[in-house]
Amino acid sequence: NAVFDFCLKNKIKLIYSATSASLGNKGKDKNLSPYAFTKSKNLEFLENLRKWFNFKYEVIYFYNVYGPNQICTGKMATVIGIFEDHYLKKKPLPVVRPGSQSRRFTHIDDTIEVCFKAWKQNKNRHLSVTNKKSFSILEVAKLFNSKIKFLPQRKGERFASALTKINNSNKIYKHYGKINLNNYVKNFLQKHSKIN
């Protein structure tokens, strides 16, 4: 709430990072995790700020962003970052069971392009930046031509990537990334096969 208050007092437009996790399963997935629940409630609060105070914002839904300088270890690590880290350390790639969970992956360059677009406009819009193709986590792991280690299934795990359509009374404007995950991984493997 401190960020909302600061923007409101200083008449600053907020670019808010939303999550598609809160929209999955026709909105029922918002209670799957504290993260999805909090993001969902913040969107409701933003809508009210707009109605009450003419608050300016743009909301962007991100889908598994990957690319240079991504986080590769720890709780905030990206799927692609974890796989790259394990590949470089010659460790089996960890895949949470069953592995058929599907996700959409978006390169950071495509993401930045949409963020810049949102910053320039002044329309109180909801935008999503994603890729048209989704992959199962197991499919992604197999792109690395590496050994795979299955981990136990996690509570609150989503099985499909929710493509955003409508949030509250807002249309979501879709932007599709141009950079292909297969090519990205292929380039990563070529680059590091020369080093190893």
Locate the predicted segments by residue:
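Conserved Rossmann-fold NAD(P)-dependent oxidoreductase catalytic core, especially the SDR/UDP-sugar
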Residues: 1-34, 58
